[in-house]
Structure formats: structure tokens, C-alpha cells
């Protein structure tokens, strides 16, 4: 069996040094405890996460490309990892251990002898310097910052020299410059290399969050971006011994508390006969918020460009005039929407594209127009959830996948069909942006769904006309009778009013109100909707505010937070459950989506019902619970009401711990349950079964995985190719693994075992096979990842 990763969706971690654009054209970024490697030019004009690197055990805080095949990362698990990777994703990794707290910034540089000098800074108030050569690493120095904290650091080789300069910023609003000295014993024997402090650059009035070096002829330029909204450019220029003697300033007599801007040159001795002058080149002001990232780029003509990213939702490219005055050349960013701003930005290797990642983990990419260099246009990018993904559901024909997350959003993922290219998957809409963490969802039809969050209400939504038009165009949807019926009657879109949680429908007439009737408040609404005809998948800015679905109805009836939802295949029934500690609240409520009225309440469980599943023909409703039992309800003839017909108890229940998941086979002959006790049980109705509470249902096959908790299970939508009695099941575990099994006549056979790099590195929350002829599996987990796999049987 071959399993190919068709789609991976995940957001960038909320850290300032957490994304980098490498010289190989790939973007690496921290994604929960993993590192995602994305190709932003996949198939020319698309984007795709190629693979993930999993070794960190806590959140990844920082990533830094050192070369085309070397990547350095640091995480909250107090380690840094040096990765060596090739185009296929095959990696070797070397773990740098020594810190006692989370590593928050890293850098590295290749030296003239071919070895690597690496620097790591952590929350344990230390900076560690390492050498790496021939697959061996050594920590040769630890710089203690006393009670200080390092936000950013950079290493740089001085031009025409093997001398290394270390710059780092701390919580004292300064930038420290250190250089290496070779210490010798009294008789001239070398004791080894050590870095010593040479100077502190003062002037900023708040923490410095971004640093970057660039070589300018024989000089170095250092850019520092600060939370005081200013960028300072520092020039480090070589000086002869004669110049040094004329201009020398005794640095040791400078007060460390002198906050005054010092424009005069400061002479540094970096080596025995190497003298450098440090001076303030320029101060740039253009941002209205904290500056979190700066990045240099040198054009083929040796012209310098500086990129700055700020929490004020803008990214600026700065360029010097002929007179040497630095001016703003390009400004891009977000407008409107529920966003905070940018946590970092980078140039591509050729400088014709720029990337920024936001507080909510979304990526933005802009590319320079070849014909009009001053025009930068937004491009297609991959994003995802920035919180644990708790539920997913396929549209009934497999046209799209919808996911719900603790980041308070539901997102719709669909393929982008282009002529002459394989489809690539992208986020096409964000139907719900809520004020509560999302928990569950169920699709009622192609353009209607219900969702539950950490509130007592079930909310239902219907797609607006603008989404239907764009969805058809991007995904190549034809023969869409459901959409044809809705197009003329539906609102164009939706928006969320100030201080509201409900998506309010926006009709065409809303935008045609005479301007004379508008108050100043109405002219600039907090969240607005403008119909857009999309040719490509939408950018993050559009997704945040222009792809909401109008809310149809709120369903009241539960006493606690919604926990699980399920709908029949035809969307004629909706079932919901909530968190419960007694039988009254553990009841399942059935709703009629045609009039949104309660049909009945189903009793049977004592504690929270964790998952629900209707049989393909809607005859049965299966529920599993925290009370370690499953209940089966059967639909009464010519009625919409259900009745409890089978359940397990202490004497006949196979499971001994909470039952997390359940599913039906496509033919309705079997259902499966999985539990924290590591057991997966397939149940079938047998005529000769004597157990009264089971009413003929009995365990047909039990799979037990020792020391595993099975948190998700799913049947495929067809038999194994060429058979009429062989089923395929997928299991997800608490450790993040996905296992695919063949099940035939009570026997299990493992077909494929996906490791943490291929699957998830935290708990798998939901699995579901895509409806249709293809064998494709969707998964989501607590690691923020949503994945779609294409499975080929060999």
C-alpha cells in the first residue's frame, strides 16, 4: 500500500522567529511541535506543504535556514536541532542539548574551514555557542545574561576576514556586539576560542525584536527593529591603525546607562590588527506599532533593500536614494478583519517575492510584477488552523472538507483545478469565525452545516451566493442542482456586527443604501462584506472577513457545552449531545432541519456522549460515551422517532475505558468502536446471539493495541478492490499515529502504519474517508494539522 500526502494544512506558531525563506525556495515554519516545509511556488503558481519534520516534543519557537540543505530549529523542549534534508524530505538530525528552558532564537554560519558556528539563546538567560563538523558538535562557550533575556541574535563573518561577529538584543533595549578572541596561555599555547563583548549599541527605547546583517562592500550594515516603532541602521566599517589612533574612543569609560543617541564613531578592536568603527547610519520611522522582524536583501546590482514587518498590519520595503537617504519604497499588508498584525517577514532568495506571517498564524505572500516593478500582487499560499482541530466532515459527494478547531473557526478546504496541472488543495472559505472554541460540526447538505462550540447552542449556517459562484469556478463543480436552486434566493455574503457572535446575512440591497443616509459610524464598519469573483484561492485577508456564511438558526436545548454532532446522509435529521455528568444531560437531541424543531430526546447514557454516527440508510443511530458503553437506536417504521434497541453493559461490554469513536461500514452490516483501552471492536448482528441487552449484536472482531489509546476510527466507503467482504479501516491514536487495516471475516491485517512525520505528533481527533471512488482519508489532530492522504493499494 502506498500512502501519499495530498494536502497538509497548518498555521505558523505565534512566535517572532518562527518562519524563514530558504535559498532553496522553501519556506520552513514552526507548526505546533513540528516544522512544516512549504513550497510557495508549487507547480508554478500554487503552494503546498511538502512534508513535516517531527522531533521536538514541545512548541517550535524558531527556525533558521543555514544553507539549501541545513535548517536549525529551537523549541520549548529546551533543545535545538540541526536538520540535514534533501528534496524528498529524507533527513538527518543532530540534537543540541544543554539549555534548561525553551530555545527562542538560533543562528548559524559556515566558517572558512568548512565547520559551522551555531548560536542558540533560551529562556534560561544564556546564549550557547557551538561548533559543528563531521557530524559532531561541541558547545565551547555559554554566555550568561544574568537575569536578562535574549530576543534575537545574528552571526556574521566580517568581510575579507574569518572573524565572526555576534549581535544579540536583550530586554535592556540595547544591541550587544561580541567577537571571538583566541585565548592563549602564558607560553603562547592556545586555550580555545571565546567570544568577548566589544560594545553595546544604545538608542532604542524599547525591546529590540529583530536583527539582521548584510555586507555592503567592505562594511557591514546591521538593522535593528524595536518595539519603539523605530528601525536603526548601524554601519560597521574597517579602519586602519592610523585612523584608529586619530578617532579612538575609550569604550570602557562609556556609561552603560547612557541612553543618549551617539552618532559619533566608536572604534572596536576585533582581532590583533583589525579595527572597526561603529556608527549610526540612519533611523527609519514608518510603522505605527511594534516592529517584530527585519530582513535584508541585496539585488544583483548590489542595491540594498530592507524588509520590516510590524504588528500594525503592514510590511514595508525600504530602499536608499542616491543621496543615501532611506525611504519607504513599498508598503503592503492587511486591511480590516479580525487580525492583530505581523510577527515576521522575509524576502525570497531572488528578492522578487516577500512573505509575512501573522499573529493568527496566517501567511501572506506578495510578488513583484515583472512589467511594473512598483506593483506587488498577493499570491496563493497555504494556511491552516492555529489551535487543535477537533472535528472534520466531508461534503456528501466529497467536493470539499470542512474542519472545526479550538482557534474558534471552521474552515473549508477544497481542490483548485487548473488546466494541465494536478489539483492542489487550499482553504476556500472560513464560514464561521466565532467567539468560542469550536468543538463539533455536521454537514446537512452541500451548502448547509451545523456546528457546536463551547457553548450550549447549536448554530446552523447556509452558504452565500458569492461562495457558491467562487466554489464552482475554482473547484470545477458542474451539474450543481443544489446550487442552482439556491443562487437566486440566497444572500450574497455575511458579516459579524460589532460585539456580536452571529453571522448576519448581507443582501445586495445592503450596499445600495443611499450614501446620504449613512452615519459616520456606518461608513467604516468593523467587519464588512464585498462580493469578489475569485480566479484563484483567496488570500488570508479575504478569508478573514469575506467568506463568512450567514447563520440560519440557533438551536437551544442542551444544558452544557456542545460535544458531538451527526447528521443523516440526506440531511433530514440532526443529532446533538453536550458535556454531561448525569443521565439527564447525556440525552441525545434529534432535530428536524426543515423547521429546526426538536423531534425527541434519546436516553441511554450516564455520561458525555463522545461521538455519534448514523448508519448509511439512516435506520440506526449509534452513540458512544464516557460511561464506556455504546447505545444503538433504531428508527421506527414510517416515523422519524428512534428507539433504543441495543446497548452494552458491564457484563457484555468489551471496552473497559472511555469509548472515543465509532463508525459504520458503507453497507451498514458492521459498526466499529474504539477506546482508550487500546481495543478496536467491530460489531455485527447475529441471529443466534443470546445477549438480551445487545439484541443480536455481538463482537465480530477485536483488535487490541497494547499501550495505545485509540481516539479515532473510520470505515472506508467501499470494499477492498476486487472483493465483496473485505473492509478497510483507519485508526488514529493518542500519540498521533495512523494505522490502516484490512478487516475480513473477523480477521485483522495491517496494511500501512503512518509515523508521526507522516501523520500527527499529538492526538488524532477525527478520521473520515472521502466519499467517492478514490480511496482518500482525511485526518485532524491536536497538533493543529489537517491532512488528506491518497491511498493506493499495491
From Swiss-Prot:
It comes from the Eukaryota. GO terms for biological process: establishment of mitotic spindle asymmetry; tRNA wobble uridine modification. The keyword Repeat applies. It holds the Pfam family WD40. Disruption phenotype: RNAi-mediated knockdown is lethal in larval third instar (L3) stage. RNAi-mediated knockdown in sensory organ precursor cells abolishes central spindle asymmetry during asymmetric cell division. PROSITE patterns: WD_REPEATS_1, WD_REPEATS_2, WD_REPEATS_REGION. Pathway: tRNA modification; 5-methoxycarbonylmethyl-2-thiouridine-tRNA biosynthesis. Keywords: Cytoplasm, Cytoskeleton, Microtubule, Nucleus, Repeat, tRNA processing, WD repeat. InterPro entries: Elp2 (IPR037289), WD40/YVTN_repeat-like_dom_sf (IPR015943), WD40_repeat_CS (IPR019775), WD40_repeat_dom_sf (IPR036322), WD40_rpt (IPR001680). It is found in: Cytoplasm; Nucleus; Cytoplasm, Cytoskeleton, Spindle. One of its GO terms (cellular component) is spindle. WD repeats lie at residues 55-93, 98-140, 147-188, 203-244, 286-328, 337-376, 384-423, 433-472, 557-601, 604-643, 654-693, 705-751, 759-794. PANTHER family: ELONGATOR COMPLEX PROTEIN 2 (PTHR44111:SF1). Component of the elongator complex, which is required for multiple tRNA modifications, including mcm5U (5-methoxycarbonylmethyl uridine), mcm5s2U (5-methoxycarbonylmethyl-2-thiouridine), and ncm5U (5-carbamoylmethyl uridine). The elongator complex catalyzes the formation of carboxymethyluridine in the wobble base at position 34 in tRNAs. Binding by the elongator complex stabilizes microtubules and promotes their growth. Component of the elongator complex composed of Elp1, Elp2, Elp3, Elp4, Elp5 and Elp6. The elongator complex associates with and stabilizes microtubules; efficient interaction requires the full complex. Belongs to the WD repeat ELP2 family. Folds into a two seven-bladed beta-propeller structure which is required for elongator complex assembly. This is Elongator complex protein 2. The lineage of its organism: Eukaryota, Metazoa, Ecdysozoa, Arthropoda, Hexapoda. The gene is Elp2.
Amino acid at each position: 500500500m502506498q500512502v501519499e500526502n495530498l494536502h497538509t494544512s497548518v498555521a505558523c506558531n505565534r512566535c517572532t522567529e518562527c518562519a524563514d525563506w530558504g535559498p532553496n525556495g522553501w519556506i520552513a515554519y514552526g507548526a505546533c511541535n513540528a516544522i512544516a516545509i512549504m513550497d510557495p511556488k508549487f507547480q508554478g503558481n500554487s503552494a503546498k506543504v511538502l512534508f513535516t519534520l517531527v522531533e521536538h516534543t514541545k512548541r517550535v519557537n524558531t527556525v533558521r535556514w543555514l544553507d539549501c540543505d541545513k535548517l536549525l530549529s529551537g523549541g520549548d523542549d529546551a533543545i535545538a536541532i540541526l536538520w540535514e534534508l534533501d528534496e524528498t524530505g529524507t533527513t538527518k538530525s543532530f540534537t543540541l542539548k544543554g539549555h534548561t528552558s525553551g530555545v527562542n532564537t538560533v543562528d548559524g554560519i559556515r566558517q572558512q574551514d568548512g565547520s559551522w558556528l551555531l548560536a542558540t539563546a533560551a529562556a534560561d538567560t544564556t546564549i550557547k555557542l557551538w561548533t559543528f563538523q563531521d557530524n559532531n558538535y561541541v558547545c565551547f562557550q555559554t554566555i550568561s545574561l544574568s537575569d536578562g533575556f535574549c530576543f534575537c541574535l545574528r552571526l556574521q563573518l566580517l568581510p575579507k576576514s574569518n572573524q565572526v561577529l555576534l549581535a544579540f538584543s536583550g530586554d535592556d533595549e540595547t544591541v550587544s556586539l561580541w567577537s571571538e578572541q583566541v585565548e592563549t596561555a602564558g607560553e603562547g599555547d592556545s586555550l580555545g576560542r571565546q567570544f568577548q563583548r566589544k560594545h553595546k549599541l544604545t538608542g532604542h527605547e524599547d525591546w529590540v525584536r529583530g536583527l539582521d546583517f548584510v555586507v555592503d562592500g567592505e562594511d557591514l550594515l546591521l538593522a535593528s527593529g524595536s518595539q519603539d516603532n523605530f528601525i536603526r541602521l548601524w554601519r560597521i566599517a574597517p579602519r586602519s591603525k592610523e585612523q584608529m589612533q586619530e578617532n579612538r574612543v575609550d569604550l570602557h569609560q562609556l556609561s552603560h546607562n547612557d541612553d543618549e543617541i551617539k552618532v559619533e564613531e566608536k572604534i572596536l578592536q576585533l582581532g590583533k590588527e583589525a579595527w572597526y568603527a561603529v556608527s549610526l547610519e540612519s533611523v527609519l520611522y514608518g510603522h505605527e506599532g511594534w516592529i517584530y522582524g527585519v530582513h535584508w536583501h541585496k539585488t544583483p546590482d548590489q542595491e540594498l533593500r530592507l524588509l520590516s514587518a510590524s504588528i500594525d498590519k503592514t510590511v514595508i520595503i525600504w530602499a536608499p536614494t542616491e543621496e543615501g537617504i532611506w525611504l519607504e519604497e513599498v508598503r503592503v499588508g492587511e486591511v480590516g478583519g479580525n487580525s492583530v498584525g505581523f510577527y515576521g517577514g522575509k524576502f525570497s532568495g531572488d528578492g522578487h517575492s516577500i512573505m509575512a506571517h501573522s499573529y493568527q498564524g496566517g501567511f501572506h505572500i506578495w510578488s513583484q510584477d515583472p512589467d511594473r516593478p512598483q506593483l506587488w500582487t498577493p499570491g496563493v499560499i497555504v494556511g491552516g488552523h492555529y489551535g487543535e482541530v477537533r472535528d472534520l466532515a466531508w461534503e456528501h459527494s466529497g467536493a470539499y472538507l470542512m474542519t472545526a478547531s479550538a482557534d474558534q473557526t471552521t474552515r473549508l478546504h477544497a481542490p483548485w483545478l487548473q488546466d494541465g496541472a494536478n489539483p492542489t488543495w487550499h482553504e476556500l472559505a472560513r464560514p464561521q469565525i466565532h467567539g468560542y472554541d469550536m468543538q463539533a460540526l455536521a454537514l446537512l447538505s452541500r451548502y448547509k452545516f451545523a456546528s457546536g462550540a463551547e457553548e450550549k447552542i447549536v448554530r446552523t449556517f447556509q452558504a452565500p451566493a458569492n461562495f457558491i459562484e467562487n466554489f464552482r469556478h475554482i473547484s470545477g463543480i458542474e451539474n450543481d442542482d443544489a446550487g442552482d436552486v439556491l443562487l437566486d434566493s440566497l444572500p450574497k455574503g455575511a458579516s459579524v456586527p460589532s460585539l456580536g457572535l452571529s453571522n448576519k446575512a448581507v443582501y445586495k440591497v445592503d450596499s445600495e443604501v443611499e450614501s446620504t443616509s449613512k452615519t459616520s459610524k456606518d461608513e467604516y464598519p468593523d467587519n464588512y462584506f464585498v462580493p469578489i469573483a475569485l480566479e484563484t484561492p483567496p488570500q488570508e485577508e479575504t478569508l478573514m472577513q469575506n467568506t463568512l456564511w450567514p447563520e440560519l438558526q440557533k438551536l437551544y436545548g442542551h444544558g452544557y457545552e456542545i460535544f458531538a454532532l451527526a447528521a443523516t446522509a440526506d440531511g433530514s435529521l440532526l443529532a446533538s449531545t453536550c458535556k454531561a455528568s448525569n443521565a439527564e444531560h447525556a440525552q441525545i437531541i434529534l432535530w428536524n432541519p426543515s423547521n429546526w424543531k426538536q423531534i425527541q430526546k434519546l436516553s441511554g447514557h450516564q455520561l458525555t456522549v463522545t461521538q455519534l454516527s448514523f448508519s448509511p440508510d439512516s435506520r440506526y443511530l449509534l452513540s458512544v460515551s464516557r460511561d464506556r458503553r455504546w447505545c444503538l437506536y433504531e428508527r421506527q417504521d414510517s416515523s422519524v422517532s428512534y428507539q433504543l434497541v441495543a446497548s452494552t453493559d458491564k457484563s457484555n461490554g468489551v471496552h473497559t475505558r472511555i469509548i472515543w469513536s465509532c463508525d459504520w461500514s458503507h453497507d451498514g452490516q458492521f459498526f466499529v468502536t474504539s477506546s482508550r483501552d487500546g481495543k478496536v471492536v467491530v460489531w455485527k448482528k447475529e441471529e443466534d446471539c443470546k445477549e438480551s441487552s445487545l439484541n443480536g449484536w455481538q463482537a465480530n472482531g477485536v483488535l487490541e493495541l497494547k499501550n495505545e489509546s485509540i481516539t479515532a476510527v473510520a470505515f472506508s466507503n467501499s470494499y477492498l478492490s476486487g472483493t465483496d467482504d473485505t473492509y478497510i479501516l483507519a485508526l488514529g491514536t493518542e500519540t498521533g499515529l495512523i494505522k490502516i487495516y484490512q478487516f475480513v471475516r473477523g480477521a485483522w491485517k495491517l496494511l500501512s502504519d503512518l509515523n508521526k512525520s507522516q501523520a500527527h505528533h499529538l492526538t488524532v481527533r477525527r478520521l473520515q474517508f472521502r466519499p467517492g471512488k478514490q480511496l482518500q482519508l482525511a485526518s485532524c489532530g491536536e497538533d493543529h494539522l489537517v491532512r488528506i492522504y491518497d491511498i493506493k493499494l499495491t
